[in-house]
Curated annotation (Swiss-Prot):
The UniProt record lists the keyword Coiled coil: yes
Keywords: Coiled coil, DNA recombination
Chain segments annotated as transmembrane: none
GO biological process, one term: DNA recombination
UniProt protein name: DNA recombination protein RmuC homolog
Length: 513
């Protein structure tokens, strides 16, 4: 309360003091502000100077850095150049080393060739020497042969003269008796000829009778053949009409022709080829190709028979060019349709076979195939673009014969491999047998040595066992059967030294030797 009262009493004085203090503070603040601005200007000038100095320093450093970078780049380029030159030098050095090794090998090979050349020259000199010796011997033999030939010619001349003289004598001696001998010889020749003529006459008569009978039989057979021919003609007409109108029968007839070609190819059904095999593709659709021909190395090729006879029959019997051209176009169209349908089957993607990339499309009628190829050669290429090869009975037979030869070669190779394996096994067996025989021979040798030692102990030496046993007989020992006399004699005649060799050989030793 006292303080508040004092404040109220001195209020005006306090306000005056405060106003004076405020003016003083404003003056002080202005002075401080001016001083601060001056210091700030000084600091800014110093900072600007330092910044300018630092910029100069940085520029100098950048210039130095640029110079150093250029020097460093030059050093890198020089280093790369030196490395490249070093690699080139290393490559050249390796090439030189390789050439040195090659030259060394060539030198060794040259030395080897030189040695072989020396050997060949030595052999040549030896052969030339032998040739000269043979030529000398041949010349001597030739001279001797010429001398022998001259002797033979002179002997031949003498024999010729003697033969002429002897022939004259024989001619004079035989002239008197030649007539009698001629008559006898003529009778000897004519009598068998007469008998042969009579026999021939009899054979002619028999043959005439036999031919008459056969002629009658032949007439009968010709009539039967005529009836059979008429029947076959009717059946051929019926078959042609049936084939024209029934696609199933056409297909069956094509399969029959295909079966004949397969039979003539040498391949065996059930071994090298199969017919009417049911297969399915990845989608589960089932297909039944006509024939699957197996190739070596577990490969297969599919043959599908396609019959196109209707248009070809019209082409064959056409009377005008327009009819023939129209039928030919239909025939080509039918073949192309068959090719297109066969290409869509994708036989090479069927499960269960590893087929080749192409299928053989079999055309049973050879003329129909030839007419189509001659009229449109592009038909073959179009078919091959769809992995189809067109074949006729002739070309298919050639292909199948080739496959048969492949199988023959494969079987020969298999047989050769089997023979080699069996030969190897036989050689092993023979080696084991020889080893056993060697062991048996060693055992027999040991047994023979043991036998020789036992026999030496038995019959050699003054105190051998047989001599001592025989002395018991002199002492009155009763025996049931005597020792064989040859052993007793050998024991009595044996030398005094022990282990003397025997004169005779044991039968076992004879067998071993």
């Amino acid at each position: 309360m006292f303080n508040m009262q004092w404040i109220f009493e001195n209020q005006s004085a306090l306000w005056s003091a405060l106003v004076s203090a405020g003016a003083t503070g404003v003056a002080i603040g202005w002075w401080v502000k001016q001083r601060y601005q001056l210091k700030t200007q000084l600091l800014e000038q110093q900072l600007e100077q330092q910044s300018h100095w630092h910029a100069q320093q940085i520029q100098q450093l950048n210039e130095q850095l640029t110079t150093a970078q250029q020097e460093l780049d030059e050093l890198d380029a020089l280093r790369d150049k030196n490395e490249f030159e070093l690699k080139q030098s290393h490559g050249k050095l390796m090439a030189v080393l390789e050439k040195l090794r090659y030259f060394e090998a060539v030198k060794q090979e040259r030395q080897q060739y030189a040695d072989e050349l020396n050997q060949v020259r030595a052999a040549k000199a030896e052969l030339e020497s032998q040739l000269r010796e043979q030529e000398a011997r041949h010349q001597q033999q030739l001279v001797a042969s010429q001398e022998k030939l001259q002797l033979l010619e002179r002997a031949e001349e003498r024999l010729k003269q003697q033969f002429e003289h002897l022939a004259n004598q024989v001619f004079e001696h035989k002239t008197a008796t030649v007539d009698v001998q001629n008559r006898q010889s003529l009778e000897g020749l004519l009598t068998p000829l007469k008998e042969q003529l009579e026999g021939f006459k009899k054979q002619v008569n028999d043959s005439f009778n036999h031919e008459a009978k056969e002629r009658h039989t032949l007439v009968h057979e010709l009539r039967n053949l005529q009836r059979l021919n008429e029947q076959m003609a009717k059946e051929a007409v019926n078959l042609t009409q049936a084939l024209k109108g029934d696609n199933k029968q056409q297909g069956n007839w094509g399969e029959v022709v295909l079966a004949r070609v397969l039979a003539e190819s040498g391949l065996r059904e059930g071994h090298e080829y199969q017919t009417q095999v049911s297969l399915q593709n990845e989608a589960g659709k089932r297909y039944q190709p006509d024939v699957i021909v197996h190739l070596p190395q577990n490969k297969q090729v599919v043959i599908d028979s396609k019959m196109a006879l209707v248009a070809y029959e019209r082409y064959f019997h056409a009377e005008t060019d327009s009819e023939r051209d129209s039928a030919l176009r239909e025939h080509l169209l039918a073949l192309r349709n068959h090719i297109r349908g066969l290409g869509q089957k994708d036989y090479h993607q069927l499960k269960g076979i590893q087929s080749l990339d192409y299928v053989l499309m079999f055309i049973p009628v050879e003329p129909a195939f030839q007419v189509a190829i001659q009229a449109d050669p592009s038909l073959v290429n179009d078919a091959m673009e769809q992995n189809i090869i067109l074949v006729s009975p002739t070309t298919l037979l050639v292909a199948l014969r080739t496959i048969d030869n492949l199988w023959r070669n494969e079987r020969q190779n298999q047989n050769a491999q089997l023979i080699a394996e069996r030969a190897s096994k036989l050689y092993d067996k023979l080696r084991l047998f020889v080893e056993d025989m060697e062991g048996l021979g060693g055992a027999l040798d040991k047994a023979n040595q043991s036998y020789q030692g036992a026999m030496n102990k038995l019959v050699t030496g003054r105190g051998n066992a047989i001599r001592q046993a025989e002395s018991f007989k002199q002492l009155g020992v009763e025996i049931k059967r005597s020792i064989p006399q040859p052993l007793i004699e050998r024991a009595q005649q044996a030398p005094d030294q022990e282990n003397a060799p025997l004169v005779e050989r044991h039968p076992i030793e004879d067998k071993v030797n």
